[in-house]
Amino acid sequence: MKVWDLHCDTLYELRRAEKAGAPKSFLHNDLHIDLEKLRQGDYLLQCFAAYVDLADPAPGADPLVSVLEEIDIFKRLMAAYPEKIAPVYTAADLERNRAEGKFSAMLTVEEGGCCKGSLGVLRRLQELGVRMMTLTWNYPNELAAPNANPGGPLVANTETGLTEQGFAFLEEMEKLHITADVSHLSDKGFWDIVNHSTRPFAASHSNCRALSPHNRNLTDEMIRALAEKGGIAGLNYCASFVDADSAHPKLCRSTVERLAKHAAHFKQVGGIEVISLGSDFDGIGGQHELETAADMPLLAEALRREGFTEDEVEAIYWRNAYRFFKNNL
């Protein structure tokens, strides 16, 4: 079963290893994702996020520099293993990579704050190959507010959403065919996107709030709106977003059976076409039954036990994401 994963933080971990003077091989390493694990998991495409923490305490830390360094790592990986993996910037790239038997890699950004409110920076990121971007991570920025807030993980931010510059970014992202990613965005920001977007958008790594009440997950109303706009949501393997006990993350566990329940809820509320995968590999800790990309057959088996047909499992694993990006790149 082919796999299309909408989100991982592997570039961040590779950059961190380089900064520590102990670079990791992309052929085989101790991370959740490397080329061997992608082979074992039968991957078609992995979205690689250039992620940055705006509160990075490192002296002289600059979010844009951090993102550019991660993009540089992405480019170097593509150049180092051209016979195994190749970037996807257009739908034609995907078809060519499939025909040549290569893994595909799509470049994304997690934290629109790296642009510092500059549309010029956004346009440059698109030229470098970025095809999806979250407006926020866990901190307010020039574009929007997140759901992370002092009230804790069970409290959603319904008061602040996109800024004036955030709306300008949304408009420009749609012109540039950079998919707007609403994962991490506040509830208010989500509805701002719904009400002002003209193209489908994604929640690259978010689950169902009805099953796990963390504010990073989507309410049923959000799932319906996302589906109506032609969007997709990637199942996130993070234990706090999978388990029902989101208020106690140290006690949470992510199992394939529980992930299958989230998939079933997505299907019931928004239909099968809204569901995709968004592992958050290399960005999550804790107890996870899916320990690496090599373990993906386990989730397919759980989905079948949950009652999904083979066609539906295939839709979740790659066909929905393939359709979405074929129409939106």
Predicted features by range, described:
Residues G117-E127, N149-A202, N215-G230, E257-E273:
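Histidine/acidic residue-rich metal-binding segments in metalloenzymes
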Residues K19-Q40, L298-A300:
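Short catalytic helix/loop segments, enriched in acidic residues and glycine
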Residues D30-H32, E36-R123, N138-K175, W191:
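A metal-dependent hydrolase metal-coordination microenvironment
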Residues D9-L11, Y51, T90, E110-G112, ...:
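Active-site beta-loop-alpha junctions enriched in small/polar residues
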Residues N236-Y237, V269-A293:
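Short acidic/histidine-rich active-site segments
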Residues H7, L38, T90, G129, ...:
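Conserved, mostly hydrophobic/aromatic
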Residues K2-D5, L45, S104-T108, R131-M132, ...:
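Structural preference for beta-strand elements that scaffold enzyme active sites
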Residues E291-L329:
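Mid-to-C-terminal alpha-helical segments outside catalytic/metal-binding sites
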